[in-house]
């Protein structure tokens, strides 16, 4: 599942105007913090991370920032099949997000417990 689909499934609208933050929890697991903000030109930035405490300081453990562009970036038809292109530099991160981290969050059952919406 794509991170944007997961966020929508737990009630987070990444396209809300402003800089918004959400905290999600699941008993026995680290809380998840999600922040969203707009960068202009139909671009939305999303940060997803877990925070842990180390020597009294908050440390991000798995902190991923990605941007969502609300337009078609690349489209190519090959024998009637859709092919998406991702930078080689980001392919490993994309695979981790879609096939590991999001699946783990779903299985762990994180739910939104706090919202800070900039109106």
Where does each model-flagged region fall?
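Amphipathic protein-protein interaction modules
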Residues: 51-89
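Helix-rich interaction surfaces within compact, conserved domain-sized segments
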Residues: 74-119
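Negatively charged, low-complexity tracts enriched in Asp/Glu with abundant Ser/Thr
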Residues: 1-53
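Acidic-enriched, low-complexity/disordered segments with a strong bias for Aspartate over Glutamate
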Residues: 13, 31, 41-42, 57, ...
